[in-house]
Amino acid sequence: VRLRTWQAKLLAPGDPTRRRSRVLAERDPSQLPWSELGVDVVMECTGLFASKEKASAHLAAGARKVIISAPGGKDVDATVVYGVNHDVLKATDTVISNASCTTNCLAPLVKPLHDHIGVLGGLMTTIHAYTNDQVLTDVYHTDLRRARSATQSMILTKTGAAAAVGLVLPELDGKLDGFAIRVLTINVSLVDLTF
């Protein structure tokens, strides 16, 4: 089933320039009009195109660079947490990952600890707001954790955030592990690290 591309124009109230912003919805990023619009950088925040191969569809559509707002794995040009390893960026990078929100919390916490004390290993727990891949009411699911209502349950689940720190700080690769407790808030999370 192919859905049609949806387009609209948005005019922000009170905008003195009276500029209209195009709003687009397209299941296949390679069909977006990035070339026509002169787009330099796409922020890929759907969670559906979180690898270099998949995010490159934006490049095929005419964007010059893509920043994935999720862990991108080892195939992206770089995984970057600003303030921790942003110096690894190169002008030739076309698809980079900004890791996850939890990795962006954990990496700045663990870097100075490792630099000044040394981290041999650690366990991280994140108390995390629920996310859009969770169900809002109890439903059937083969993974019982995924069957519970995000709006009424505290749900223990896995997270790749601790492992993703190894992509940002290679000297810690394989030394951190962690889990998440998804809680009934739509925003705000915290990280607890034992090392």
Task: Give the predicted meaning of each segment.
Residues 1-135, 139-147:
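N-terminal Rossmann-like NAD(P) cofactor-binding subdomain of oxidoreductases
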